[in-house]
Amino acid sequence: MSRTRTTPGRRVESDVVDIGEHEFESGEILPDLKVAYEAYGEFDGQNAVLVCHGLTGSQHVAGHGTESGVSGQARAWWGDIVGPGKAIDTNDYYVICVNVPGSCYGTSGPASEGPDGEPWGTDFPPVTVHDWTRAQRRLLDHLGVGRLHAVVGGSVGGMNALDWAVQFPDDVERLAVVASAARLDSQCLGIDAVARRAITSDPNWNGGDYYGEERPSPDAGLGLARQLGHLMYLSKDSMERKFGRRSAGRGERGDAFPSDPAASFFPYREVESYLDYQAEKFAERFDANAYLYLTRAMDDFDLSEGYESDAAALAAFEGEALLVSFTGDWHFTTEQSESLAGAFRRGDVPVAHHVVESDHGHDAFLVEPEKVGPPLADFVDEGVAGRAVTDTAPDGGEPDEDEDFAPVHSSLFSR
C-alpha cells in the first residue's frame, strides 16, 4: 500500500508496485515483479532525479524528518546529500530511489515469496545491472515520469547510472557517476568471489534454502563477506588512523567467530572488534542470497559489452556527465574515472571529472558530504558549467596522454 507523508519541507511517497511480467536478461520470466521505491518532493514534469543505491543500499535515500536516534538501514543512506535544502534539493526536484531486483528491501528477490508461497531462494532468476535499469524504467513509467532531469549513482549505483546512458540515452539529461567505474578490476572480482564463498561455505546456507523461523541463517558467512567489504571500502590511512594496533576489550563480540586455542594469549584488536560489530549488524538487516545475487550483478557489468569500446557504448548519449572520484579509493580509482571521462570526451559528451582529495577510501562518497555535495548540487542545477565543478581537463580537452595522469584535487566547502 502506498504511504505518503507530508511534513514541513518534506513530501515522501513510499510504495511497492507490481509492474507485471518481467523478462530478465537471462531469459527467465517473472510473472509479477514487485518494485519498492521512495519518492521525495513534487513532480512538475521536468524535475525528476533518479538516485541509484549502492550494493546493499535501499530505496531509503533521504530522511523523513523523524530519524533521530535510529541507525542501520532505518537511517537514510544519503540523507546528508538528498533532502530539503541539501545538495539534491527535494524542494526543487522530484527524487526517486528504487530498490533493485535481487535485493531484499521490498523489491522481488531471493527472499521474496515465489509462486508456491515459499521464498524463491536460489530459484530466483539471475539478475544483472541491465535488469535493474529496465525495472527502474518501468517503475518510472508507472509513476508517469518520462525524461529524467538527472540520474545519480554511487559505487555500483554509478554503474546503474551509466547503464541508463546506454539503454535509455534519450531519457537522461544529466548523468552523475560517483566513486564508480566502467567495470570491476580483477582484484575486486577476486575479493567478491571470496566473499561469496564465505557465504556458500557456511553450513547454514544449505544451498540457499535457509528461510523460515525454525532454520538458522548463514549469518557467519554473510558476516565474513561483509567484513571483506568493509576492508575494501576503507583506505590504509583511514584504518591506521581509526584503529592502529590498539587492543579492545573482548566482551561478547570477541567470540563472534570460532578461534584457535592460542587466540586468548594474544590481544583482540580494535580493528577486529569493528569488523565483528559490522558483521553482526549487517546480518540483522540483509539477506545472504541477495548478497550473492547483487555481487554477481556488479561483477558482470561491463560498460563496453556488446560494443567496440566504452566510447562506442556511450555514443548515443547526448546529455552532460559528471564523474566524481576520490584519491584514497582503491575500489574505484581516480584512474578508472579518468579513463571513463576519456570515453565521454571521445564521444563529444560534455563531461567533468571532479577529483576529491580524501583518505577515507571508497566510503568517502558517503561520509564526506561537505566535499561531495557542492559539485553534485551545481551539476544537477547547472551542468558541467556549475561553479563547484572542476575537471582534470579544465580547457575541455583531453589530458596529455604522454604525461602521467595528475588529477586536479579539490577541497570544497559549503555552497
From Swiss-Prot:
Which residue ranges does the record annotate as region Disordered?
A: 383-415
Question: Where mainly found?
Answer: cytoplasm
What is the uppermost EC class here?
A: transferase
Keywords of the record, alphabetical order, are: Acyltransferase, Amino-acid biosynthesis, Cytoplasm, Methionine biosynthesis, Transferase
Residues involved in substrate binding: R226, D363
Which terms under GO biological process does the entry name?
A: homoserine metabolic process; methionine biosynthetic process
Location in or out of the cell: Cytoplasm
The chemistry this enzyme catalyses reads: L-homoserine + acetyl-CoA = O-acetyl-L-homoserine + CoA
Q: Which residues form a coiled coil?
A: none
* Cellular component annotations (GO), alphabetically ordered: cytoplasm
Q: Extract the InterPro entries matched here.
A: AB_hydrolase_1, AB_hydrolase_fold, HAT_MetX-like
Q: What is its EC number?
A: 2.3.1.31
Question: What residues make up the catalytic site?
Answer: S155, D329, H362
Q: Name one GO molecular function term.
A: homoserine O-acetyltransferase activity
Keyword Chloroplast annotated: no
Q: Does the keyword Transmembrane helix apply?
A: no
- Residue ranges constituting the AB hydrolase-1 domain according to the UniProt record: 47-369
* Biological pathway: Amino-acid biosynthesis; L-methionine biosynthesis via de novo pathway; O-acetyl-L-homoserine from L-homoserine: step 1/1
Q: How does it assemble?
A: Homodimer.
Q: Which family does it belong to?
A: Belongs to the AB hydrolase superfamily. MetX family.
NCBIfam families reported in the protein's UniProt record: homoserO_Ac_trn (TIGR01392), PRK00175.1 (NF001209)
Q: What role does this protein play?
A: Transfers an acetyl group from acetyl-CoA to L-homoserine, forming acetyl-L-homoserine.
- Name of the protein: Homoserine O-acetyltransferase
Query: What organism, scientifically named, is this protein from?
Result: Haloferax volcanii (strain ATCC 29605 / DSM 3757 / JCM 8879 / NBRC 14742 / NCIMB 2012 / VKM B-1768 / DS2)
